[in-house]
Amino acid sequence: MHRWVVHEFLKETTTIGQRDPRLAVTALYDSTDERGPDFTMVYGSTFTSKNYDDNIKNRVWYRKYLDDYFRINEFEVFNSPINFRLIRYADVLLMYAEALNGLNRTADAYQYVDRVRARAGLAPLATVRPGMTQAQFQQQLEHERITELTGESLRWNDLARWG
């Protein structure tokens, strides 16, 4: 995963001023815990205690479907209790909002994006970005899909659809 994905998550805070909680379940990197590498846990140890070289310290890995927080050893055995989702309701809501926006029904589309944002504790778009044009709303949808669906094998289809 690239660092720009992390930066997408850091563009907004929740309604109570905290970092987007989806970041911690999507990415594993030196500051997955916002307090830094001394608090970021990797298989039961802190990121700092691993003594990774600089090449490793600067990387970002996918955390979705990883069971590192259920285990305390160094080995991934891929027996996580986390179900693999083929399609998520959040994806359906965002696709529907995109379709409405494509039909120039941008005002109607807000409510579907807001359902996804509410689960993450983010403020409604009508509050933080009211009156967006069709193009602005599309750009916001692209951000929403990155922060909600990264690591779920949907990005290629998004890019192909957006041109």
What are these regions (language model features)?
Residues 7-10:
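Beta-sandwich/jelly-roll carbohydrate-recognition scaffolds of carbohydrate-active enzymes
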Residues 1, 13-163:
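Acidic/polar-rich alpha-helix caps and helix-coil junctions
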